[in-house]
């Protein structure tokens, strides 16, 4: 039996099953205090003038237990494991003894064998001639692309898959397609007869064994005509040099920059005019390629401004040295021409700079809302953090503390603690406080959930553990009340005051349920009924195990039905002057104690 801070505790199922002395679930379940053997008290043993603490139980929630808050995937997995499947029913013993079940299983095996006949391995045994192929609606085999329509498609015979079936045969092989005459007489109107065949680049050649008709179409076996190469944009002649970038490798530009240093070195030799003329002669060779690739935004285009300056000396051949200087001075003007293209790069960082504040603004607003507005106000709150001093043996969590944590706006310290505690699941003890993460929401009914410790299932868990005692206590209270004298109640009420441990109750009287088992005078009266309580037995002292209170969270549950006697109540109104009244005249009760005695 676990003993936590001198209090014997056990789980609820072990208390109900009279196994509290053998309980070893101190790391798995919520621990409930075990009452001492004997009949419960017929009256409230709390001292007069003090709040009744009999209506509450201090339970211990293990910190090492797994979080019982269910997840969607875990529930589906566990439910699928325990739900009986139809495959398991024939294996049950009843199905083996019943003849009908055996026949059903046999029929099921036959159906399974029939299904296996459709396996991929059985497709190899099928006759290819008996397979009926259905072409696509567009005749091309690709979705969304229309096929080429030819005027002779109707004379090619029935397409594959559209073969009429005979009266006795289910599959009829398709007849060979009829290709008809040459395609030259049936050219489409879009290509006139006088148009010469297209000229393809030398790197694109048609194989010799393929016979081409007019227009470059090749007849295929299925009755269609396909072009071996894509029809170029220029059909009536060779492509210009500017389009070679699309049909072949670009012209080698590195040869031109090599000539520029030689041309620039000639003016330094003394013949300035020859250098300029030489640059002018080589300039027309360089002027041809630039105009065509100019609109293309490719990297070679950026190298073209370096080649453009040589034509400028051609306009001023009089001064060789001046022309070279003018060419160098004229090189900067083409660079501003490239500035519009270069200005395309700054908008990208500008867009990024404009986008990042838009992304950072919601974060700042969200953090301000988290500081000024309590996260618990949102219905999706999953983390609850208690101060470090709460949840201990001396200061257990009670409904007032729980409501305070829920309704109080968070401080900066409380706001930082949930962040460090959100990584792991379950109960987490941090330096700043105790936190628990629960994904069930406000309707959580998990037993031992630190975020919702006062749910109905938690209260029912404790009430079920004490239900046998309460039933016997009600029957015993009727007998004791009949045999007890009026002066016995004040004595029993005042007896806890004379106990030396009485002064220790005020600091923690709201949370400690130790006073009920304190009065030992009644234990002798209830010794005859010792076998009645099912909770604790004296001989099992070897099974007791001392546990530290640091491994548990303590919660005080307000359960009023656990009090053995009647709670503090008075039928009078506020003007009550009854001597010894525990509600209205608590100050005069010690004076009347002597009269009762």
UniProtKB/Swiss-Prot annotation:
Alphabetized SUPFAM superfamilies for the sequence: Zinc domain conserved in yeast copper-regulated transcription factors
Keyword line: Activator, Copper, DNA-binding, Metal-binding, Nucleus, Transcription, Transcription regulation, Zinc
Compositionally biased spans, kind Low complexity: 104-115, 469-495
Subcellular location as annotated: Nucleus
Region named Disordered: 70-115, 233-352, 407-428, 467-541
Signal peptide extent: none
UniProt keyword annotation of Methyltransferase present: no
Polar residues bias spans: 92-103, 521-530
InterPro entries to which the protein is assigned, alphabetical: Copper_Homeo_Regul (IPR051763), Cu_fist_DNA-bd_dom (IPR001083), Cu_fist_DNA-bd_dom_sf (IPR036395)
GO molecular-function term, one example from the UniProt record: copper ion binding
GO cellular component terms given for this protein: nucleus
Domain of life: Eukaryota
Binding site for Zn(2+): 11, 14, 23, 25
Entry keyword annotation includes Nuclease: no
Listed GO biological process terms: intracellular copper ion homeostasis; intracellular iron ion homeostasis; positive regulation of DNA-templated transcription; positive regulation of transcription by RNA polymerase II
Pro residues bias (residue ranges): 287-314
Positions with biased composition (Gly residues): 269-281
Function: Copper-sensing transcription factor that regulates copper uptake by transactivation of Ctr3, a high affinity copper permease. Binds to the palindromic UAS sequence 5'-TGTTGCTCANNNNAGAGCAACT-3'. Also transactivates Sod2, a mitochondrial manganese superoxide dismutase through the palindromic UAS sequence 5'-GTTTGCTCA-3' with 352 bp separating the two inverted repeats. Loss of function indirectly leads to rearrangement of mitochondrial DNA associated with senescence in wild-type strains.
Name of the protein in question: Protein GRISEA
Source species of the chain: Podospora anserina (Pleurage anserina)
Organism placement in taxonomy: Eukaryota, Fungi, Dikarya, Ascomycota, Pezizomycotina
């Amino acid at each position: 039996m676990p003993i936590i801070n001198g209090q014997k505790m056990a789980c609820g199922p072990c208390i109900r099953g009279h196994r509290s002395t053998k309980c070893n679930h101190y790391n798995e379940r919520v621990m409930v205090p075990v009452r001492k053997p004997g009949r419960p008290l017929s009256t409230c043993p709390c001292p007069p003038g003090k709040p009744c603490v009999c209506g509450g139980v201090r339970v211990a929630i293990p910190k090492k237990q797994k979080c019982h808050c269910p997840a969607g995937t875990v529930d589906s997995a566990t439910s699928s494991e325990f739900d009986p499947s139809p495959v398991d029913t024939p294996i049950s013993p009843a199905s083996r003894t019943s003849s009908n079940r055996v026949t059903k299983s046999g029929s099921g095996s036959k159906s399974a064998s029939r299904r296996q006949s459709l396996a991929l391995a059985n497709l190899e045994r099928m006759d290819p001639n008996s397979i009926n192929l259905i072409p696509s609606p567009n005749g091309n085999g690709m979705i969304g692309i229309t096929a080429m329509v030819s005027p002779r498609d109707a004379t090619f015979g029935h397409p594959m898959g559209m073969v009429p079936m005979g009266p006795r045969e289910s599959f009829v092989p398709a007849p060979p397609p009829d290709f008809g005459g040459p395609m030259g007489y049936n050219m489409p109107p879009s290509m006139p007869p006088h148009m010469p065949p297209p000229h393809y680049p030398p790197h694109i050649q048609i194989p010799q064994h393929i016979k081409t008709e007019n227009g470059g179409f090749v007849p295929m076996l299925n009755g269609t005509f396909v072009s071996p190469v894509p029809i170029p944009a220029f059909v009536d002649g060779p492509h210009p040099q500017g389009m070679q970038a699309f049909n072949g490798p670009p012209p080698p530009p590195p040869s031109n920059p090599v000539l520029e240093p030689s041309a620039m070195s000639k003016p330094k030799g003394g013949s300035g005019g020859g250098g300029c003329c030489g640059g002018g002669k080589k300039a027309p060779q360089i002027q041809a390629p630039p105009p065509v690739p100019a609109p293309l935004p490719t990297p070679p285009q950026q190298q073209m401004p370096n080649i453009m300056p040589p034509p400028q000396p051609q306009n001023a051949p009089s001064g060789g040295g001046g022309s070279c200087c003018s060419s160098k001075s004229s090189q900067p003007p083409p660079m501003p021409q490239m500035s519009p293209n270069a200005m395309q790069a700054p908008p990208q960082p500008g867009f990024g700079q404009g986008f990042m504040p838009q992304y950072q603004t919601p974060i700042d607003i969200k953090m301000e809302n988290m500081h000024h507005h309590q996260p618990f106000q949102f219905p999706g709150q999953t983390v609850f953090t208690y101060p470090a001093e709460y949840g201990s043996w001396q200061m257990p969590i009670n409904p007032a503390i729980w409501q305070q944590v829920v309704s109080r706006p968070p401080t900066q310290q409380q706001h930082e603690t949930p962040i460090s505690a959100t990584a792991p699941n379950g109960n987490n003890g941090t330096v700043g406080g105790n936190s628990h993460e629960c994904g069930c929401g406000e309707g959580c009914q998990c037993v031992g959930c630190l975020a919702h410790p006062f749910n109905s299932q938690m209260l029912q868990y404790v009430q079920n553990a004490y239900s046998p005692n309460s039933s016997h206590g009600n029957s015993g209270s009727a007998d004791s009340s009949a045999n007890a004298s009026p002066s016995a109640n004040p004595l029993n009420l005042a007896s806890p005051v004379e106990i030396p441990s009485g002064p220790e109750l005020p600091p923690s009287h709201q949370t400690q349920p130790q006073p009920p088992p304190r009065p030992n005078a009644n234990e002798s009266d209830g010794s005859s009924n010792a076998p009645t309580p099912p909770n604790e037995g004296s001989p099992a002292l070897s099974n007791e195990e001392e546990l530290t209170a640091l491994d548990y969270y303590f919660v005080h549950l307000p359960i009023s039905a656990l009090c053995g006697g009647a709670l503090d109540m008075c039928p009078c109104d506020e003007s009550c002057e009854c001597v010894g009244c525990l509600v209205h005249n608590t100050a005069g009760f010690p004076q009347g104690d002597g009269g009762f005695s």
